Amino acid sequence: MKKLTLLFVLLASVSVGCKKKGCTDANATNYNANANSDDASCTYPAETETGPYLIVKLHFDSLAPRLDNFGNPATIPSNHWAQSPVFYGMSAHYIEFAQNMYTQLGAGEILYHGAETTAGGSNAVDFSKAIIKGDNEVFMKIPLKNISPDTYNWVRMSLTYQNYSLDYRYNGVDYNGRLASFVGFNTYITNYKIWNQTVTLNANKLQGYWGFENLGVVVQGQAAATTVPNPLSATSPVPAGSCVVTGNFDTPFTITGNETEDIICTMSLSTNKSFEWYDANGDHKYEPGAGDYPTDMGLRGLKPIITP
């Protein structure tokens, strides 16, 4: 009898010593049915957002007004020329709805603020996490319930990246190449693909950095300026180098909080002669080999368009 009791004790001790740790919550995504000891590793599905949504789209308009930094019509300076590129992709880092002309940057309704990093030293946009979309594509969807009920008159959008084709001339022959330009305040770039070629940097690049590719050859450079139209510069300025483009709704846009259907907000961006260069010989052809160089590659205006 003593031997039998001792056997039970030994079996009990073995049972206690063989506890299997894991997630014991059946509602978790990593529930372990074989676990008998919770190890605090449970993970749960992210809360699914529901509509209706504000659907933000991008549109590139080469026929829209060409504006300067103050939102006024802009002409091309003497000894310069410009062309309207064909856009293949663009990224924005920040979107904000502003109530009126006195609403300061950051004091409106911030709809989106992209990822940033200090991996390259100073704070910068994290290009590896950038959302890049083409013409008329959906940039993002925001549940309308997450937007504060109010009436908004202006949109502010910080652009960070552009990818487009350019016509140029070399040794008397016309070609078409691809340019990737980084127009954000500062961007940490691990690598990026221009057309067929990938450029590896693992470094920060300030506003105006660009890479150009054609026939398998990549050339890199830095533009001297980036136009950022802000019609509210007198009442609500933006920091230099921020690339925050400002545009107004044709009619005030009101969020009531009782919306039942999706609303589309198309960010129509002016690409009208947005790539400008110093034209050394005045032939209106972009000829890097003849002394031409980029002087401006900023967008030339923003018009937010609401479609119920």
Predicted regions and their residues:
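A short, solvent-exposed, low-complexity linear motif enriched for acidic/polar residues
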Residues: 46-308
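Bacterial Sec-dependent N-terminal signal peptides
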Residues: 15-56
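A generic structural micro-environment signature
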Residues: 7-10, 29, 37, 98, ...
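Sec-dependent bacterial lipoprotein signal peptides
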Residues: 1-17
